[in-house]
Amino acid sequence: MALEDRTPGQELGRALRELTAGQEGRPMFVELYGGREAGPGGGIGALELRRAAVETAGCRERFDQREWIASGSEPSWRLEVTGRDMMLNVAGSPAPQRGAHGGLSRSPGAGVSYAASDDPGFVVVFEERRCIDPLSGSLFAYAVEVRSEGRSYSGCAAHNPAMPAP
């Protein structure tokens, strides 16, 4: 089945070249918006690139009940958000920080956010804008900022594709 790159600026093709570094046959995981072309020889028309990575579990990645998975570096950290709580794991910390939240809040032009019910300083804000992981070069549709225990962490996020978009 043929794939036609109709993304702005041929972003899909550019991501393929940059992430695979010219290594023919290197697998790349992508999430995209597009449509199936009708008729004989019809393929897929890619309209928007949502996520692209080579060093990932890709389709095997398990979101389970998680709505969001986010990560960043300096220091290395990972965030998971479910329908009820959020958990921040920072490298070097003795234990992950966990907090129940009251659901997402929308702010016009500022994305969606979650705040821990029992710790108003534990706040997560997801913004729909291109984010490129500085270590892997992977592309994401969401940028994230996490504030916790007086610190701020910035990184990239993936939304569970099996759940409604925020």
Residue locations for each model-derived region?
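Surface-exposed beta-loop interaction hotspot
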Residues: 39-83
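Short, solvent-exposed beta-strand/turn "edge" segments of beta-rich domains on protein surfaces
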Residues: 19-23, 131-136
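Small beta-barrel nucleic-acid-binding modules, principally OB-folds
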Residues: 1-28, 118
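Short, solvent-exposed aromatic-acidic interface loops
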Residues: 52-54, 73, 93-94, 157-164
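Central antiparallel beta-sheet cores of small beta-barrel/beta-sandwich binding domains
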Residues: 1-8, 66-125
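Flexible glycine-rich surface loops and low-complexity tracts that mediate binding to linear polymers
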Residues: 21-45
